[in-house]
Curated annotation (Swiss-Prot):
PANTHER family listed in its UniProt record: PROTEIN-TYROSINE SULFOTRANSFERASE 2 (PTHR12788:SF6)
Gene Ontology BP terms: peptidyl-tyrosine sulfation
Enzyme kind, highest EC tier: transferase
Protein name (Swiss-Prot/TrEMBL): Protein-tyrosine sulfotransferase 2
Post-translational modifications reported in the UniProt record: N-glycosylated.
Active site, UniProt feature: E99
One of the record's GO molecular function terms: protein-tyrosine sulfotransferase activity
Record-level GO cellular component terms: Golgi membrane
Gene source species: Macaca fascicularis
Glycosylated residue positions: N343, N368
Parts of the chain on the Lumenal side: 26-377
Organism classification: Eukaryota, Metazoa, Chordata, Craniata, Vertebrata
Disulfide bonds: C96-C156, C225-C233
Site (Transition state stabilizer): K158, S285
Function: Catalyzes the O-sulfation of tyrosine residues within acidic motifs of polypeptides, using 3'-phosphoadenylyl sulfate (PAPS) as cosubstrate.
Amino acid sequence: MRLSVRRVLLAAGCALVLVLAVQLGQQVLECRAVLAGLRSPRGAMRPEQEELVMVGTNHVEYRYGKAMPLIFVGGVPRSGTTLMRAMLDAHPEVRCGEETRIIPRVLAMRQAWSKSGREKLRLDEAGVTDEVLDAAMQAFILEVIAKHGEPARVLCNKDPFTLKSSVYLSRLFPNSKFLLMVRDGRASVHSMITRKVTIAGFDLSSYRDCLTKWNKAIEVMYAQCMEVGKDKCLPVYYEQLVLHPRRSLKLILDFLGIAWSDAVLHHEDLIGKPGGVSLSKIERSTDQVIKPVNLEALSKWTGHIPGDVVRDMAQIAPMLAQLGYDPYANPPNYGNPDPIVVNNTQRVLKGDYKTPANLKGYFQVNQNSTSSHLGSS
């Protein structure tokens, strides 16, 4: 009996020693890691700090990191970016939300720092290397996108000019995808001029100037899209999205790897609803996207562009032809609409659509207000 008790005590003692040895070993490894970080000229971020964790109203936990498949929607303003993001927002698994406005500004600053040799030298000398800046940009952009709206399985950002930085963003977020909204530049320019959408660098009193600036902006974005590659960047033609919404959205969701939902065809029914489409009262497209997809804005520009500009169109905006638009057609033949779009258009012309309760009375009061976008050099 005494021998048996001794064996039990001996076994318990050995187990205790083993546990203490394991704990001591773990502490030694942790101390080494800390000391290595202290000796290193740059501290290392712990892996768990690289993820954002958010809990939705449904008590589901969402984890976001640099490897997540973010969606970036952009293009020249007045090219259908708001319609595109509203359609995506209608999907139960996607959240885009309003324009952040700050992301394209920060991207422009980052680009300016890298372009200036003197500034880059100063930053490098101060230890603010490209690696440091990129890590900060990555964290900042992810934080803004994730926290400016409700969490969702798939996050999307819509700031028109972000797609001037598609190559850089694809480096920060390697699994991200991009939707470049493309629209007939004549329609985009007519819309920004008549709706007084101020964009830095665009002279809204001149069709010629605005078309020249449109050409420069879409040229940069299209080149970035091509460089990123067809597997990651999809040009989406506004006209085709409006004429054939079901066909276009099936292609878009397939490209994004997102399952089909009929809700994307009826974004107007989900405006202002929980988990639906949130609209900003200060974005100039809001009064249009509360309506079902319709033909109202497709060819409004015809007959309004000055004759000398129409005559020189191919030289002023060569990107029109490159994107497949006929610079001399007034109006071009964009194609025949689906029956549902014809029906929607008839409803809109009769005023047969609902204004969300939170926006009622707003459009009458603010119809003459302006909205601005940050352009870039």
